[in-house]
From Swiss-Prot:
InterPro entries: SinR/SinI_dimer_dom, SinR/SinI_dimer_dom_sf
Name under which the protein is recorded: Transcriptional regulator SlrA
Protein encoded by which gene: slrA
UniProt source species: Bacillus subtilis (strain 168)
Gene Ontology molecular-function annotations: protein dimerization activity
Function summary: Required specifically for induction of eps and yqxM operons by antagonizing SinR. Regulates SlrR activity. Controls the initiation of biofilm formation.
Oligomeric form and interacting partners: Component of the SlrR/SlrA complex.
Keywords annotated in UniProt: Transcription, Transcription regulation
Amino acid sequence: MKTHVKKDLDKGWHMLIQEARSIGLGIHDVRQFLESETASRKKNHKKTVRQD
């Protein structure tokens, strides 16, 4: 099961990097964006209302 999840993550990461490169971004830009998204989610976690 773990290897299946890892393969999905690897595939998703690869697709994200390909998409970023197609619009002229590098891996550093993607990593910086992901870190800023994670930080903003942690700050706003209590304010977020789930909509299922």
